[in-house]
Amino acid sequence: MKILVLEHELPNATAEQFQQFAVAEARKAWDLHQTGIIRELYFRADQNEAILVLERASVNEAQEALSTLPFVQNKLITFEVIPLKAYSGFERLFAKD
């Protein structure tokens, strides 16, 4: 299942805390990418938050993988996890009237 993930910084997180765990976060994100869990990873252009595309069997599996990230473990960020399905709108082009 393809899963869209939106990062949200928690209000009490400080720049110093992010700096403290930045290398460990990048290393873990790299590991998740190399194992195929994180398929795509971006920063938003309008703010300093990440957008991820994960491939997992379920939302629960995605949340388990995300919980291994140091920023999550140290309560600096949270994620909005959105399961996706294939777009079926093109079927309308071929429907018999």
Task: Please report, for each region that a protein language model flagged, where it lies by residue.
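Conserved, structured core segments of small domains
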Residues: 1-97
